[in-house]
Structures are given as C-alpha cells and as structure tokens.
Curated annotation (Swiss-Prot):
It is an enzyme of class 2 (transferase). It comes from Helicobacter pylori (strain P12). It is found in: Cytoplasm. Binds 1 [4Fe-4S] cluster. The cluster is coordinated with 3 cysteines and an exchangeable S-adenosyl-L-methionine. HAMAP family: RNA_methyltr_RlmN. Reaction proceeds by a ping-pong mechanism involving intermediate methylation of a conserved cysteine residue. CDD domains: Radical_SAM. Belongs to the radical SAM superfamily. RlmN family. This is Dual-specificity RNA methyltransferase RlmN. Its EC number is 2.1.1.192.
C-alpha cells in the first residue's frame, strides 16, 4: 500500500527526494496551496517527477462523510478512513476574537478558529463520563490522518491560508498513547501549515510516565491535564487510569514540565453535579495545585446517551471559579460550544456510516 505524503516531515522528504529542495516545493503545494492531486503541481515539477510521486505516494486517505453545524457556528465532522472505512470525529470551534490596533489603540473584532482533532479511533482510557469510550478502542490514527482533519476542515470553511488555527488534541483518544504519531503531526502542523507550537495544546488523562518523554521532545506545545477530581477515590471511579497513575504521581511529573516565563499548565476539571462541584472540592484543588504554575479550566458535564451523571448549575460553577480566583489561582469556565450537536467535550465517538451524527 502506498504511503501517504502527509505522513512525511519536511526533514524526511528532504532526505528522500532528490534534489532535496523539492521537499520545500512539495510542502508549499500541499499545505499552502491545498493541492490534492500531484498533476496540479506541474508548474513546478517535471512529468517524470510527477509520475514518481504518483507511483510512490498517495494524497488523501480520509474524507468528510457528514457535517453538522451548531447554532453557535461550530461544526462537527465525521471522517472516514479510505483504507479501512473506520470513522472518527473532529470539531471546528468558532469564537469571537478581539485585538487592539497598535497604531490607533482601536479594538478590532474578528473571529478565531480552533480545531479539536482526534488521535485515535476510540480510546483505551475508559473515562466514565466520556462517550468516546463507549465504542471501545479500534486503532491509533496516523500523523497523516491527524493532519488531514485540520486541512479538510480549513478547506471546507474556505479559511484563507494565512488564517491561523489553534489545534487542540482533545478529540477522540489519549494523545500520549499515540505519542510518535502525535509528535510527528505537531512537527508537520508547524513546518507545513505554519501553526506555531504555542497554538497547539495536548490534553492528557495523565499517562504520567509519558509526560517526561513528551517534555524531552521540546516541541513547545501547551500541556493540559484532565484532573477532574481532588482525591484518588473519586478520580479512580471516574478515570480507571488513576489506579496506575494516581494524582500525586501525575502532579510530580507536571512539576517538571518546562514552562516559559508567562505560561502555565492547564488543569481541566469536569464539574459533575453532587460529585465534585462543591466548595470543599475547590479548597482541596487549591491545596493540590499549590506551587504549580497553573490555571484551571472548569467544564460543566456535557450529557450524553446512557450517562448516569448530571450537569451542575452555572451558579455552582461560578462559585467554584470565584473561590479559586479569589485565592490567586486563575480559573475560567469553558463555554460549552457545540452542545446542541453533541460535539462538546466528552461527546465524540466512532459511528457507523449509517448513523446520524
């Protein structure tokens, strides 16, 4: 089976293609001009080189099979692998953006886009609150399949080349359980799509022994930890992974994470009614994160079919956040985008092609 051209970093292509400058030209066609056929690249390449590319590589290995749009402008995408017909989802989040004009000091309003990508089909972690785990684990996604999620979404929305995206690994799967492909995808996002590592966030459920491996790669990405509880008993009931990597174990590795001067590690905390949303939990969380440059992102539980958990009130979430902020721990409440199309946090899963999304 031919290799996908999107699976190769710029360095790998430079070593493979002769002369090596062909790699940069090819990257320009792929990631700046969105060409999906080697024949469309004939302005730069000879017929013999085009024939070589067609013989050795394939381009698109996934396709969009369905799109569902939210009232807030967000979109959920169902992708199908052209190799094995398995499906997976990704989400485009559309948000308002405000910037200050440096010359006039005027406030400029615009839009910013975040693509929430999947790195696995299904998930092995088995978090009790997450819909993804309902379908079990199928396989890891290749770097090319991760990259194409962002490319296809950007094309589908006619976003200009220069329009920067934020990439968050918060879709289906645990990024640290597919670390090699995730890291390769990040390198290609950076060198191919020109997405700064500062715009890329990896969210992990806390695979503690792989956090230092990720840190050692010096990718410059942002780290987010799915914490969701302040004691091991509660966290283990929500996240079975905690039995292997408990809270203390995870936090010990987080403390070693290299941070730029103004950066913080994000801790994601899912608020579930009458389980972990009280002020007693907020006080324990404050104590847990003492000494760590951190910020807390509160997520109100997003209901899905078959779940026993309930969404807490916005009032209780605000009380939780206000307490942490009053004590000097930066805390925000995540706006639940795309809730009406079941594309919010914890609502993605593999679907049969006959199913609606």
């Amino acid at each position: 089976m031919k290799a996908s051209i999107y699976d190769f970093t710029l360095k790998e292509l430079s070593q493979l293609l002769k002369p090596s400058f062909r790699a940069k030209q090819l990257y320009l066609w792929l990631y700046a001009k969105y060409k999906t056929s080697f024949k469309d690249m004939q302005n730069n390449f000879s017929k013999d080189f085009i024939a070589y590319l067609e013989r050795e590589f394939t381009l698109r290995t996934i396709e969009i099979t369905h799109v569902r749009e939210s009232v807030d402008g967000s979109k959920k995408y169902l992708f199908k692998s052209l190799r094995d017909n398995h499906t997976f989802e990704a989400v485009l989040l559309k948000m308002k953006d405000k910037k200050i004009d440096k010359e006039t000091n005027a406030i400029l309003e615009g839009e910013k886009y975040t693509v929430c990508v999947s790195c696995q089909i299904g998930c092995q972690v088995g978090c009790a609150f997450c819909f993804t785990q309902k379908g079990g684990f199928v396989r890891n996604l290749k770097a090319s399949e991760i990259i194409q999620q962002a490319l296809l979404i950007k094309e589908d929305n006619n976003l200009p080349i220069e329009k920067a995206l934020n990439i968050v690994f918060m879709g289906m799967g645990e990024p640290l359980n597919n670390l090699d492909e995730v890291c390769k995808a990040i390198e290609i996002f950076n060198t191919g799509m020109q997405i700064s590592p500062k715009r890329i966030t990896i969210s992990t459920s806390g695979v503690a022994d792989k956090i230092p491996i990720l840190a050692g790669k010096n990718l410059g990405v942002q780290l987010a930890i799915s914490l969701h509880a302040v004691d091991d008993k509660t966290r283990s009931s929500l996240m079975p992974l905690n039995k292997k990597y408990n809270i203390e174990c995870v936090l010990n590795e987080v403390k070693k994470w290299p941070l730029e001067q103004r950066k913080r590690v994000m801790f994601e905390y899912l608020l579930i009614k009458d389980l972990n949303d009280g002020l007693d939990c907020a006080k324990k969380l404050l104590k847990l994160l003492n000494g760590i440059k951190s910020k807390v992102n509160l997520i109100l539980f997003n209901p899905h079919e078959g779940s026993k958990f309930e969404r807490p009130s916005l009032e209780s979430a605000r009380m939780f956040a206000d307490f942490l902020n009053s004590k000097g721990l930066l805390c925000t409440i995540r706006e639940s985008k795309a809730l009406d199309i079941e594309a919010a946090c914890g609502q993605l899963r593999e679907k049969k092609l006959s199913q609606q999304i």
